Amino acid sequence: MENIHIQTKSKEYDVHVGKESLSHLTTIVQNMQPSVSNIMIISDEAVAPLHLQTVVDALQIDQKVFSFVVPSGEKEKSFENFYAAHTSALENKLDRNSLIIALGGGMIGDLAGFVAASFMRGIRFVQVPTTLLAHDSAVGGKVAINHPLGKNMIGAFHQPEAVVYHTPFLQSLPEKEWRSGYAEVIKHALIGDVKLYHWLKEEVQTLADLRDEKLIHILTKAIPVKANIVAQDETEKGVRAHLNFGHTLGHALEKELGYGNITHGDGVAVGMLFAIFLSEQVYKVNLAYEEMKQWFLKYGYPKMPSDLSVERLVGLMKQDKKANAGTIHMVLMQEYGVVNVVSIPDETVHIALEAFQKDMGIRSR
């Protein structure tokens, strides 16, 4: 098992990665001070039948353990489920010494984390990710729910007590979820570990290579990229925005196509390609966009739909959290491993997006 130490201004904790990491969950809970009074596990209908009982059995403790299960899918990261989780917590007599365990992918981590951040003004929680995508969202303390007008618009910064990354849980993932999570791995490599980027190009020829020791290697390299950035900027006042590389267009695509119709990672992959496409123009550099495009397509990432309204996408990009005074701010790449947040005029984005759409385009429906 590998341990990755996360240090922020508000909290220090460890990410436990490996085939036996779940066996440490009881010790993690027992070592908490003040002692944990009871435990609420929040999961979804896709994960709970597969892994909920395994986690309950792993918790060799005397305290009451109960679960709250929501439907699966990004659209379930809603105020309705957030409110229902609070109702369940109150009915089961959670208190300020209770613990919430987030068992699932990024959607569950965000929802459960925000419940923990807000219940009685904040209680402890532990992340138990079950997807590759969650290697990003489980670390760093950003928790949120969606609003009909935008993704992750209602939330908080609330660091977990620990992250338990039990890699056998990932083996039940469908292919599209491996691909979705791998996009965030690529993102971390491109913005913060060029050596990892070259390793991925050499060692991960297909998504089937994301298994066993290679998976653990990837997690132990990608997670520290985020950890180092979060250590510098916990509440996204500066460099933490670099982690949004590919997300400005990616989130707009998720919103426009409808949550669940495109995975987060697929949206981010298209967004990263667009960011590289635009970066070449803004910085007058060669970032090997064509080569990068072919590399992404090899893994099955989608092309940019040609029939989506560029005007609508630009409007959605202006609702992005990085936007300021109605101006789009995007994370662009000067060179591999060096990115910056750049203010881009609407017209520039519009022209570039039309050209990118023409280059990449397929029909979305």
From Swiss-Prot:
Q: CDD domains from the entry?
A: DHQS (cd08195)
Could you say which residues bind NAD(+) here? Answer: 72-77, 130-131, 142, 151
Q: Which UniProt keywords apply?
A: Amino-acid biosynthesis, Aromatic amino acid biosynthesis, Cobalt, Cytoplasm, Lyase, Metal-binding, NAD, Nucleotide-binding, Zinc
One GO cellular component term: cytoplasm
GO biological process per UniProt: amino acid biosynthetic process; aromatic amino acid family biosynthetic process; chorismate biosynthetic process
Describe the task this protein carries out: Catalyzes the conversion of 3-deoxy-D-arabino-heptulosonate 7-phosphate (DAHP) to dehydroquinate (DHQ).
Please state what the protein is called: 3-dehydroquinate synthase
Name its species: Bacillus cereus (strain AH187)
Starting at the broadest rank, the lineage of the source organism is: Bacteria, Bacillati, Bacillota, Bacilli, Bacillales
